[in-house]
């Protein structure tokens, strides 16, 4: 029996002031070019349905502008869906209130942006510890946790280097 970690059902994202009003037109066959030409709205996602099993690896691939980032940003609700359901561990992320969403983002999801923001004046350990110190974790515990994850992503020996001393891929792993 499969264990679904993330389930996305009937997800639509239309960018524009009357997005909700135009969803039914898109469902009835209005394509993205017509939506833009006639209504000056942009179709970001069109009826996306995905099940992601726990402990699986998935790849979201597509051309530039095809909606990959838009889709991913719906999982942690950095973007609000026009319509649809986004479930993580059987919890509908689209229904979380502000405090529940904050808790969800802090403790259950993470995201590494393509242009991540490492602090250039801090070494790798300090960059990794930053989130923990903001959460109030004591220095000893945050250092131990940081060293564990630095090891886990294969950056042993680089703990006290600065971001500009690492390759882009290594910096990406620090961002993880």
Where are the language model's segments positioned?
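ABC ATPase NBD coupling module
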Residues: 35-40, 94-110, 134, 139
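Conserved coupling/switch loops of ABC nucleotide-binding domains, chiefly the family-specific signature
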Residues: 82-85, 141
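Conserved structural motif at the start of ABC-family nucleotide-binding domains
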Residues: 6, 43-45, 104
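Helix-to-loop junction immediately C-terminal to a conserved catalytic motif
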Residues: 76
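Conserved ABC ATPase "signature" region
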Residues: 25-34, 89-92, 129, 133-136, ...
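Signature (C-motif/LSGGQ) region and adjacent switch/coupling loops
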Residues: 97, 105, 125, 151, ...
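Conserved ABC ATPase signature
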Residues: 162-166, 170
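Short coil-to-helix segment of the ABC ATPase nucleotide-binding domain corresponding to the Q-loop/switch region
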Residues: 121-129
């Amino acid at each position: 029996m499969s264990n679904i970690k993330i389930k996305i059902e009937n997800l639509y994202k239309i960018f524009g002031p009357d997005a909700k009003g135009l969803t039914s037109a898109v469902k009835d066959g209005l394509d993205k070019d017509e939506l833009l030409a006639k209504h000056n709205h942009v179709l970001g996602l069109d009826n996306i349905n995905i099940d992601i099993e726990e402990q699986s690896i998935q790849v979201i691939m597509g051309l530039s502008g095809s909606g990959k980032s838009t889709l991913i940003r719906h999982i942690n609700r950095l973007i609000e869906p026009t319509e649809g359901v986004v479930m993580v561990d059987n919890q509908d992320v689209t229904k979380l209130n502000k405090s529940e969403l904050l808790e969800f983002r802090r403790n259950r999801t993470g995201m590494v942006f393509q242009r991540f923001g490492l602090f250039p004046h801090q070494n790798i350990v300090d960059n990794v510890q930053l989130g923990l110190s903001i959460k109030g974790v004591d220095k000893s515990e945050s250092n131990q946790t940081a060293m564990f994850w630095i090891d886990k992503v294969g950056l042993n020996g680089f703990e006290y280097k600065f971001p500009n001393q690492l390759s882009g891929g290594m910096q990406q792993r620090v961002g993880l």
